[in-house]
Amino acid sequence: MTEQSIDNILPSSEKNVKQWYVVHTASGAEKRIKEDMLRRIAKQKMTDFFEDILIPVFGVSEVKRGKNVKVEKKLMPSYILIKMNMTDKSWHLVKNIPGVTGFLGSKTTPKALTESEIQNIFNNLEAEAKETKNSKLYEVGEIVIVTDGPFETFTGTVEEIDQEKNRLKVSVSIFGKATPIELNFNQVKKND
């Protein structure tokens, strides 16, 4: 740190108190940096200074190669949340990890998140998780194209959805008559 130390900048009431801080990282390196941080904390016997290290992520269902897979998405890409006791030693430990570009706040004075700010982040995470859980790949009434099986290339309308079994009931026209057929999610694609 330059000129003043963190220990001298923080008010005495904030010393020895663990607060949430935001650390900016290189893009896509959040997991590696978190693992490196945990190793260094253990190696330097500083576990008392750190309470939690969090990469805010939520699960999303996506169709990849015709299969429904769960993927993690970052709520705040390139950021890690750390609940820590901010001292010169803990500041330097985090700051000197390769891929860490700095703390939120000024260059020499990291800014702790307020309770309302951290609560807002956790609420956003919870909302994203609920929205993702409730979101559907397909909707009743949506037009889809059959991509596999005896009805391949047929166009149909989604009539029912079974999220647990990843199956759809699709109405297709066979010889001019609407006929319902059951298909897996990976047997259809959206008609874009």
Swiss-Prot record:
TM annotation in the entry: none
Gene3D superfamilies: 2.30.30.30, NusG, N-terminal domain (3.30.70.940)
Region forming the signal peptide: none
Name of a matching Pfam family: KOW
Protein keywords: Transcription, Transcription antitermination, Transcription regulation, Transcription termination
One annotated Gene Ontology cellular component of this protein: cytosol
Family annotation (SUPFAM superfamilies): N-utilization substance G protein NusG, N-terminal domain, Translation proteins SH3-like domain
GO biological process: DNA-templated transcription termination; regulation of DNA-templated transcription elongation; transcription antitermination; transcription elongation-coupled chromatin remodeling
KOW domain: residues covered: 140-168
PANTHER family reported in the protein's UniProt record: RHO-INTERACTING TRANSCRIPTION TERMINATION FACTOR NUSG, TRANSCRIPTION TERMINATION_ANTITERMINATION PROTEIN NUSG
Biological role: Participates in transcription elongation, termination and antitermination.
Family: Belongs to the NusG family.
NCBIfam families registered for this protein in UniProt: nusG
Name of protein: Transcription termination/antitermination protein NusG
Provenance organism: Rickettsia felis (strain ATCC VR-1525 / URRWXCal2) (Rickettsia azadi)
Gene name tied to this protein: nusG
